[in-house]
């Protein structure tokens, strides 16, 4: 398939710039993957879409304040986006500056603070920085960093973003982008789902800035996927196996939960699913045979992105494009702070071997 197969026109006005005041007030477009039928509602309709015994798998990563502004000794401005914490005093970053700095260069970080750092190494397009202070780098980021809003939200972060660009159940700091499908869950909804007998389990995938990298190859199979850290525990494995045994659905909350579960399944030998922790660069696109996930809760994604390719692989290419057309016609809100979909798996999606325009 070609990159252009995943293109669509999206009015700029539909790109959500701010979150809703109440997380669960967003709209929900439900797509039956097998039949292609769609129904519209609100996010709390999940209480009726999900059944007793279904298993929700959520990603419990937390976003670090990864965007930091700083200065060179010359006074020139720079900006870093932390991609990964390497050690208590070393981080791997994307660096934006008028000129590429040399190894050994020193900077001062913080809007008003003057935290000294040194450029220690370069790894392809990323730079390794050392914090030259005693404080832990992660703790320093909490005080000097900004919430790294996505490129399609071209504004400075605001106090509400520090709360609403995090899931209510996030526990493990390490992401530079939110697992956005999870942003719609608030505690009252989670409690109501639990009361209805819906089970929950938590994977961890620290979303990297690579999630926003565009696909540049015309033949999508030639795209090289970015790498992220993921963890699927024995507790999650047990919950998935129990869910399958009782004939219920594993419902992934977000594409990161999908990628975590399907990575663990791919790495498993001689059984259905075993625990996994490590790097994943799994790229799911049409033709992929899903092994674990039965239903998916996800936001509306960018044209030509690896995320819409994953959705097409799950729901079927034609179903997905029809759903997106409906969402645009009905003025759903798109991307990180936008509305959501609930999709049941299309068992014939992997056999869709040609694109109809």
From Swiss-Prot:
Subcellular location, record wording: Cytoplasm
UniProt superkingdom: Bacteria
Pfam families, per the entry: Queuosine_synth (PF02547)
A cellular-component GO term for this protein: cytoplasm
EC number annotated for this UniProt entry: 2.4.99.17
Keywords recorded for this protein, A-Z: Cytoplasm, Queuosine biosynthesis, S-adenosyl-L-methionine, Transferase
Entry keyword annotation includes Nucleus: no
Predominant subcellular localization, coarse grouping: cytoplasm
InterPro entries recorded: QueA (IPR003699), QueA_dom1 (IPR042118), QueA_dom2 (IPR042119), QueA_sf (IPR036100)
A Gene Ontology molecular function term of the record: S-adenosylmethionine:tRNA ribosyltransferase-isomerase activity
Pathway connected to this protein: tRNA modification; tRNA-queuosine biosynthesis
Reaction equation(s) it catalyzes: 7-aminomethyl-7-carbaguanosine(34) in tRNA + S-adenosyl-L-methionine = epoxyqueuosine(34) in tRNA + adenine + L-methionine + 2 H(+)
Functional note: Transfers and isomerizes the ribose moiety from AdoMet to the 7-aminomethyl group of 7-deazaguanine (preQ1-tRNA) to give epoxyqueuosine (oQ-tRNA).
NCBIfam families membership: PRK00147.1, queA
Family in the record: Belongs to the QueA family.
Subunit structure: Monomer.
Annotated protein name in UniProt: S-adenosylmethionine:tRNA ribosyltransferase-isomerase
